[in-house]
């Protein structure tokens, strides 16, 4: 209902209500088929020396991604770890989202292997962290933002992990 959100713990009234439920959108009965949750997983190394960052060409903290089948992305963290992620996890039937999907040993190994292929200077640096979560993909792969001034209802989503940085493109 426009201007009204009811939850298990109470009701909120507002002039505008924005639904930004991303990967959890399929849990809403009327929106079940609008977005598909896909998992993005990440690994992070132990802190790496400045010499690695210089050799890798990432000494100025550039971020990167590419468009291979397993979309990958990475960046240097504030404590000099290499945070590296990708989307090699399969879609789960019925748009299922479960905590156990946040980690996938096969994808973790694939990410580690890909990181070593792209940045051989990383050598045997230890992987100290591994995590993941669901992001939303529209079935046509187009992110969107909508607003209906008549009802005060708005929605935004399907940013496939690119998040707020791409909201101005919707």
Summary of predicted features, one role per range:
Residues 2-3, 11-51, 55-150:
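Active-site substrate-recognition segment that forms the wall
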Residues 94-102, 155-170:
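A conserved FAD-binding loop/helix module that cradles the flavin
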